[in-house]
C-alpha cells in the first residue's frame, strides 16, 4: 500500500532529491549491517562469492521489525540535525537489536565504546560475528547497546520508560517506538495515559511511533487489522493527534516521513513555547505517528515459494536451512543493498553518508540521557535524625512509622525540586505519606472539578505521580532513574506481584551494567511495601501476600537489598541509606498502622548499620548461655516475639532468652554469598551452635531456611511465618491463623527447650486456653482482646 503525500506547501521542502537519495542509502547501509549481523561470520563486504563458511552455524535474531526501526532512526537523525534536538530513541520491539547496533555503528558511537569494532572491513566482520554469538552480544537492545535504556525483551514498558525519561527534562525529546505486538500488552495499553501527566512547561516531549508491521511471531496484530478510522478514533480518544505514515515504496515513504516529522517537531515546539513563554499550561494534544510498513521490509518476498516479506514468516530469521539455493538467496538479498555504494574499499562508510549522522552527544547512541549515570547529581538529603521519634522506654510509645517516613520524604522533595519523584498506584495517602502534600501535590493535567480544591491535592506541576497501574508507576520511575534522577515507589505489599517480572527485567539490566565499564552507576530504585500482610485483616485474603520478598531474594546479591525495619527510627535510617545508594533495587517493608516503637535513634543507627543484632534490653542471658534464641524480622513478628518473651519471663523466670532482631535479611546468608552476610563465626556467636532458635518472620517461612541452610545450627532453626492462612478478621487473629502469635511462639519454646519438659506443662496449657479465649472473644465482640490490643513492653530498658 502506498499513501500519497498530503498536498501541503512544505512537501517538497523537507527532502531534496539529493538528500532523499542519501537518506535511502544510509537506510540501505543499516539494513545491510543488520542482515549481516544475523547471518554472516565472514566476508562482510561480499568481496568473494558467499559460501557456507561465511555463514553462522546457528542463525539467531529478528529481522521483521528491524528495517522499520532503521527507517525511523535515519529520519530521527535528520530532524536532530535540522532542529538541533536533544533526542533519545527508545525501542519497544527490542528484538530488533541488530538495527540499533547497526545505526550506532554507522554514526561512530559503537566503535568509540568498543574500539575493537573498528570502522573498516575487519571491524565489520567482528560486528557481524559477535551478534547472538557465544562471547559476543545479546540479540536485543540490551545494556551493551549504546543509546539504549529499554531492552525490550519483555514487552510493554517502552512508553512508560519514555515518559519517565521526559519528566523534568524540558529540553529532551524521546522518540519511542511501540511495536504493534507490544501494543497488545496491558502495561503498554495503560501507558498511553501518561500524556495526562506530561507538563509542557517543565517536562520534555515524548513522540510515540506506533509501528504497525502487521504481525507478531506467527499471528496478526490487532491494531493492524482494524480500520484506519477505528485506529484514529482510538488514539484521539487517548488524547493524541495521530499522523499516518503508510506504505512500502521507499521513495514515497522517505518523503512522507520527513514531511510528517517536520510538522510534528514544529508542533511540539509550539506547544512548549505556549507553555513556557506564553504561560498557557494545559494538557496539550500531543502528536504521534502511526507508521505502517511491511514486516521484513526489503527482505526476500518469498522463500521456498511461501510469502515472507509483509508476513509473519519474516519475524525472526526468514530462512535458516542454508542449502545451496538459500545461500544464493542470502547473497542476492545482501547485494540488493548495493554495499559497494555504501562502503569504500576498506569497509568504511562513505563520508557523504556519514555526514547524515549528528555529531558528538547529539548522536542518539551517545546521548547523555541514555547513560543517565553521567548526569546524576547526588540528592540533597536532610538529616534523618531530625525526624526521630523520642523513644525513652522500648515498646511503650506507639506511632505510624510510614507517616514519620513521609515527613522525611517531604523534605527530600523540598530540597530536590527537579530530580526527585514519588510514584504509586493511588496509595500515597493510604500508606500514610500525606506529609508530601505539604510541599507538592499530585501531578494532574486532565480535567479539574471544583471539589478538587477540597483535599484533592492536584497540581499541574506536582511531583507525586499516581495512576492505578503499578506497571506505569514503576515504568515512569525506571525511565526517570535510567536518565540519572532519583525516586521512590510505594505500593501495597500484596500487589507488588503485579510488577514481579518488571522488577526482574530491571534487576537483569542492573546486573549487566555492572560488567560494562562505560555505563555510569544510576540511582537505586526504592520500593516501599506497606499495607502489608499482617495488617490487611480488613481487606481479606486477596490482600495478604508477602511473597514479593522471595522474588527479590532470587536475584544476584550485587543488585538487590531487602530491609524490614521494626519501627520508625530504623525506617528513617534505612530510607536515608537507600536514597544514597546506587545501582540497587531496595525493597523496604514497613507497616503504616500505629505500632510500638523500640529503639532510640542512636540505637536504630547502630542496629541498621549492622543489619542484625541482639536486643540486650529484651534478653536476659547476658553473661551466660541462652537456653533459647528468639529471632524476628518484620514489625509484627517483632511485636509477637517480645510479647512471647514477656509471657516466658513471667511463667518461667529461670529461662535464659536471647532476642535477635533482623533488619537486613541478607545478613543471614554466609559472607561468601552476600557482602552483607555474617561470617560463620559471627553467626554462631549470635545464634549459638546448639541451642533452639525460634524465628518469627514477616513472610513465607521457607525463605529463612533457604538463607540459613549452610549454617551450623540450621537443624535447630524453627521458623514461623505466613502460610497462606487469612481472611477478613482482626489483626491479632491474622497472626494466630498463621501460628506466628505470642501463644504459639511460647508453645514452640516449651517444645524445643529440652530442660523445660514437664516443668512448663501448665504454661503450655495456659497458652492453649488463651487461644480458645481469643477465638471466643473476637467472635463475640469483633475486636481483639484488650490484653492483646493494649499490650506494651513492661520491663523498661533492662
From Swiss-Prot:
<dbReference type="GO" id="GO:0005975">
    <property type="term" value="P:carbohydrate metabolic process"/>
</dbReference>
<dbReference type="Pfam" id="PF09364">
    <property type="entry name" value="XFP_N"/>
</dbReference>
<comment type="similarity">
    <text>Belongs to the XFP family.</text>
</comment>
<dbReference type="GO" id="GO:0016832">
    <property type="term" value="F:aldehyde-lyase activity"/>
</dbReference>
<dbReference type="InterPro" id="IPR019789">
    <property type="entry name" value="Xul5P/Fru6P_PKetolase_ThDP_BS"/>
</dbReference>
<dbReference type="InterPro" id="IPR005593">
    <property type="entry name" value="Xul5P/Fru6P_PKetolase"/>
</dbReference>
<dbReference type="Pfam" id="PF09363">
    <property type="entry name" value="XFP_C"/>
</dbReference>
<keyword id="KW-0456">Lyase</keyword>
<dbReference type="InterPro" id="IPR018969">
    <property type="entry name" value="Xul5P/Fru6P_PKetolase_C"/>
</dbReference>
<dbReference type="InterPro" id="IPR009014">
    <property type="entry name" value="Transketo_C/PFOR_II"/>
</dbReference>
<dbReference type="InterPro" id="IPR023962">
    <property type="entry name" value="Phosphoketolase"/>
</dbReference>
<protein>
    <recommendedName>
        <fullName>Probable phosphoketolase</fullName>
        <ecNumber>4.1.2.-</ecNumber>
    </recommendedName>
</protein>
<dbReference type="InterPro" id="IPR019790">
    <property type="entry name" value="Xul5P/Fru6P_PKetolase_CS"/>
</dbReference>
<keyword id="KW-0786">Thiamine pyrophosphate</keyword>
<dbReference type="InterPro" id="IPR018970">
    <property type="entry name" value="Xul5P/Fru6P_PKetolase_N"/>
</dbReference>
<dbReference type="InterPro" id="IPR029061">
    <property type="entry name" value="THDP-binding"/>
</dbReference>
<dbReference type="Pfam" id="PF03894">
    <property type="entry name" value="XFP"/>
</dbReference>
Amino acid at each position: 500500500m502506498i499513501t500519497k503525500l498530503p498536498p501541503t506547501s512544505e512537501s517538497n521542502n523537507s527532502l531534496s532529491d539529493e538528500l532523499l537519495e542519501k537518506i535511502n542509502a544510509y537506510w540501505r547501509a543499516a539494513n545491510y549491517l543488520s542482515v549481516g549481523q544475523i547471518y554472516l561470520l565472514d566476508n562482510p563486504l561480499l568481496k568473494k562469492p558467499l559460501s557456507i563458511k561465511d555463514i553462522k552455524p546457528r542463525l539467531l535474531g529478528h529481522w521483521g521489525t528491524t528495517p522499520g526501526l532503521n527507517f525511523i532512526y535515519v529520519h530521527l537523525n535528520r530532524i536532530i540535525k535540522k532542529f538541533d534536538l536533544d533526542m533519545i530513541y527508545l525501542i519497544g520491539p527490542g528484538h530488533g537489536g541488530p538495527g540499533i547496533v547497526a545505526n550506532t555503528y554507522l554514526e561512530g558511537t559503537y566503535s568509540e565504546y568498543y574500539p575493537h569494532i573498528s570502522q573498516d572491513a575487519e571491524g565489520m566482520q567482528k560486528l557481524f560475528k559477535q551478534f547472538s554469538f557465544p562471547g559476543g552480544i545479546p540479540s536485543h537492545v540490551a545494556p551493551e547497546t549504546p543509546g539504549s535504556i529499554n531492552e525490550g525483551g519483555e514487552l510493554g514498558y517502552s512508553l512508560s520508560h519514555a515518559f519517565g525519561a521526559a519528566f523534568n527534562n524540558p529540553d529532551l525529546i524521546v522518540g519511542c517506538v511501540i511495536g504493534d505486538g507490544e501494543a497488545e500488552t496491558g502495561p503498554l495499553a495503560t501507558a498511553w495515559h501518561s500524556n495526562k501527566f506530561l507538563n509542557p512547561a517543565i517536562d520534555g516531549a515524548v513522540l510515540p511511533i506506533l509501528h504497525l508491521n502487521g504481525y507478531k511471531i506467527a499471528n496478526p496484530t490487532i491494531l493492524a487489522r482494524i480500520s484506519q478510522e477505528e485506529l484514529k478514533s482510538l488514539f484521539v480518544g487517548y488524547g493524541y493527534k495521530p499522523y499516518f505514515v503508510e506504505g512500502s515504496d521507499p521513495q514515497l515513504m522517505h518523503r512522507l516521513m520527513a514531511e510528517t516529522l517536520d510538522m510534528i517537531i514544529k508542533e511540539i515546539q509550539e506547544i512548549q513555547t505556549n507553555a513556557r513563554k506564553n504561560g498557557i499550561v494545559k494538557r496539550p494534544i500531543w502528536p504521534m505517528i502511526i507508521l505502517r510498513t511491511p514486516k521484513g521490509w526489503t527482505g526476500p518476498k518469498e522463500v521456498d515459494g511461501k510469502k515472507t516479506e509483509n508476513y509473519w514468516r519474516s519475524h525472526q530469521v526468514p530462512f535458516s536451512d542454508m542449502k545451496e539455493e538459500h545461500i544464493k538467496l542470502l547473497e542476492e538479498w545482501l547485494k540488493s543493498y548495493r554495499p559497494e555504494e555504501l562502503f569504500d574499499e576498506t569497509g568504511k562508510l562513505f563520508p557523504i553518508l556519514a555526514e547524515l549522522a549528528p555529531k558528538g552527544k547529539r548522536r542518539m547512541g551517545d546521548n547523555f540521557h541514555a547513560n543517565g549515570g553521567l548526569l546524576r547529581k547526588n540528592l540533597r538529603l536532610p538529616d534523618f535524625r531530625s525526624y526521630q521519634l523520642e523513644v525513652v522506654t522500648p515498646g511503650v510509645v506507639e506511632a505510624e512509622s510510614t507517616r514519620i517516613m513521609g515527613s522525611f520524604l517531604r523534605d527530600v522533595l523540598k530540597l530536590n525540586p527537579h530530580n526527585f519523584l514519588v510514584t504509586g498506584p493511588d496509595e500515597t495517602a493510604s500508606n500514610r505519606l500525606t506529609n508530601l502534600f505539604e510541599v507538592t501535590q499530585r501531578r494532574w493535567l486532565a480535567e479539574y472539578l471544583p471539589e478538587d480544591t477540597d483535599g484533592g491535592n492536584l497540581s499541574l506541576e506536582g511531583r507525586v505521580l499516581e495512576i492505578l497501574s503499578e506497571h506505569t508507576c514503576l515504568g515512569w520511575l525506571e525511565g526517570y532513574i535510567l536518565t540519572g534522577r532519583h525516586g521512590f515507589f510505594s505500593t501495597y505489599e500484596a500487589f507488588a506481584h503485579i510488577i514481579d517480572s518488571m522488577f526482574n527485567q530491571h534487576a537483569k539490566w542492573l546486573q549487566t551494567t555492572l560488567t560494562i565499564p562505560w555505563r555510569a552507576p544510576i540511582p537505586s530504585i526504592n520500593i516501599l511495601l506497606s499495607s502489608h500482610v499482617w495488617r490487611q485483616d480488613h481487606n481479606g485474603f486477596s490482600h495478604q501476600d508477602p511473597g514479593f520478598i522471595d522474588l527479590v531474594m532470587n536475584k544476584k546479591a550485587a543488585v538487590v537489598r531487602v530491609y524490614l525495619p521494626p519501627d520508625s527510627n530504623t525506617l528513617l535510617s534505612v530510607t536515608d541509606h537507600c536514597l544514597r545508594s546506587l545501582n540497587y533495587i531496595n525493597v523496604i517493608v514497613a507497616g503504616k498502622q500505629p505500632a510500638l516503637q523500640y529503639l532510640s535513634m542512636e540505637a536504630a543507627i547502630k542496629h541498621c548499620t549492622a543489619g542484625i543484632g541482639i536486643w540486650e534490653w529484651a534478653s536476659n542471658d547476658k553473661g551466660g548461655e541462652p537456653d533459647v534464641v528468639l529471632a524476628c524480622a518484620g514489625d509484627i513478628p517483632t511485636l509477637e516475639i517480645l510479647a512471647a518473651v514477656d509471657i516466658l519471663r513471667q511463667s518461667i523466670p529461670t529461662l535464659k532468652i536471647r532476642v535477635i532482631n533482623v533488619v537486613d535479611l541478607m545478613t543471614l546468608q554466609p559472607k561468601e554469598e552476600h557482602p552483607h552476610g555474617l561470617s560463620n563465626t559471627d553467626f554462631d556467636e549470635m545464634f549459638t551452635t546448639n541451642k533452639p532458635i525460634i524465628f518469627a518472620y514477616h513472610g513465607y517461612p521457607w525463605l529463612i531456611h533457604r538463607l540459613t541452610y549452610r549454617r551450623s545450627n540450621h537443624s535447630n532453626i524453627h521458623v514461623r511465618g505466613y502460610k497462606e492462612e487469612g481472611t477478613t478478621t482482626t489483626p491479632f487473629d491474622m497472626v494466630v491463623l498463621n501460628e506466628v502469635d505470642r501463644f504459639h511462639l511460647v508453645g514452640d519454646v516449651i517444645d524445643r527447650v529440652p530442660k523445660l519438659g514437664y516443668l512448663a506443662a501448665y504454661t503450655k496449657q495456659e497458652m492453649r486456653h488463651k487461644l480458645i479465649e481469643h477465638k471466643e472473644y473476637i467472635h463475640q465482640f469483633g475486636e481483639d482482646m484488650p490484653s492483646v490490643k493494649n499490650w506494651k513492653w513492661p520491663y523498661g530498658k533492662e
